[in-house]
């Protein structure tokens, strides 16, 4: 399922987890582990696990209000809230709407700020003919029974970053390195322990 999902979405790696909430939590934990903490810009209209995952992993949430036309954070206001301590933007694509603009994507790339896409309610939606969930450093999906695609429960973390992918696999597997499948990565982790 992970390989099929990656191919359908258009990313290199996908990791299936037990829920969209777990996808959010593991994403923030992996970012904390790999890059440290800081501020994360978040929307007030999202599922609570987006915000809880930020707080529980020692990041500081910074709220930006939504647009009424797409229910996503106002992209211009996101850019205004960015400061030297901003680590990431956790953007929710709500109800099948695209919450991205080229201006935001380019600004985040220019400033080297991580974009996390919550695509739990927008499977298959697009920005400029490219599926949502492929623009950021990571994207999270939910397969809860009330969402567009259901596995009854379940979630997915998607990325093109191999180091992040291996970290997510390790964290999903209770911290066991056997999940990684990369001896070089495993040795680096063992040296840290």
Regions found by a protein language model. Name each.
Residues 1-39, 53-55, 63-65:
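Phosphate-binding glycine-rich loop
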Residues 81, 131-134:
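Active-site nucleotide-sugar/metal-binding loop of Leloir-type enzymes
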Residues 32-110, 114-119, 126:
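PLP-dependent aminotransferase-like
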Residues 2-6, 28-29, 52, 79, ...:
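Solvent-exposed, non-membrane alpha-helical residues enriched in polar/charged side chains
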Residues 16, 42, 157:
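Conserved SAM-binding loop
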Residues 122-128, 135-193:
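Active-site region of PLP-dependent enzymes
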């Amino acid at each position: 399922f992970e390989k099929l999902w990656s191919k359908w979405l258009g990313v290199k790696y996908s990791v299936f987890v037990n829920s969209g909430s777990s996808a959010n939590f593991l994403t923030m934990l992996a970012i904390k582990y790999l890059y440290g903490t800081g501020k994360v810009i978040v929307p007030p209209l999202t599922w609570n696990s987006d915000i809880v995952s930020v707080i529980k992993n020692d990041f500081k949430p910074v709220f930006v209000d939504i647009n009424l036309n797409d229910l996503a954070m106002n992209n211009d206001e996101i850019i205004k809230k960015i400061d030297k301590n901003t680590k990431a933007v956790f953007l929710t694509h709500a109800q099948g709407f695209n919450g991205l603009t080229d201006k935001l994507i380019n600004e985040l790339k220019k400033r080297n700020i991580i974009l996390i896409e919550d695509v739990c309610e927008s499977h298959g939606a697009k920005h400029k003919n490219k599926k949502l969930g492929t623009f950021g450093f990571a994207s999270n999906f939910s397969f809860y029974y009330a969402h567009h695609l259901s596995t009854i429960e379940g979630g997915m973390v998607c990325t093109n970053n191999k180091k992040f992918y291996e970290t997510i696999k390790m964290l999903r597997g209770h911290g066991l390195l056997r999940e990684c499948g990369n001896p070089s990565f495993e040795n680096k982790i063992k040296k840290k322990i």
